[in-house]
Amino acid sequence: MKTPASLFVRRLNGLAAAALAVALAATACTPPPPEQKPQGKYPWHTNIVATTFWVGEIFNPNAEDGSQVTSTYDSRWMGSYGGCDGRITSEGCQTEARSGSNGYAPSGVKPKENPFYLDLPYDDIHNAAAFRERATVIPWANDEGYKGQDTNSSFSYMKNRWVKIRKDGKECYGQIQDAGPGEYQDKEYVFGTNDARPANKQFNGAGMDVSPALNGCLGFGDLDGESDKVDWQFVDQKDVPPGPWLDVVTTSQVK
């Protein structure tokens, strides 16, 4: 028996509607893809333990790198900065909580350099191996203002470079002013593209120290702890957005 044309069309429409319903149900049950960070020019380094340090801190007077009175890039760091980046107590220069109401500045000194500073474990001045290889591993080594400086021991490719840091939806920016923690030639972590873990095993495996201003800006849970984690990425200066991190910008080179 022949099927009337109208009945055939109705059956086709019914099948199409059923297929659409199945597709919509499958879509509704499929979880959304995880949020992806825009990659940008430089890779992201994720879930990195960040500890806190500050200009003037002396956490181990017996260790070669136990004082922040100096940095690997500035033998007079505390003087260049303007003093203790915190408060002076009977125990010396101590950190303090920071507030956005005054741009996360310290209470006892007016900084002459950027209070939004940090370190990463690559010392391109005093680590001999890092100095030799720096022009071949640092991504911006051939950029204007850097090219041709590879044998100049008074010029650091790392000092003053900008870093974007994120934690729990907050985003802040800072400049590199020292090297560490714990390691000084960790190129796989610092410049690698596969999100390598820091080589450092001290301080809960920290891969970065941040200043008290960055600690406050990012909303760290501890003033001086080892449990806060961040994501970070290098960023060119032209891409740094307005914020308190631009109130005072450090431009000095190696001292």
Model-identified regions with their sequence ranges:
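Bacterial N-terminal signal peptides
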Residues: 16-27
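Secreted/periplasmic proteins
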Residues: 33-255
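Bacterial N-terminal signal peptides that target proteins for export
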Residues: 3-16
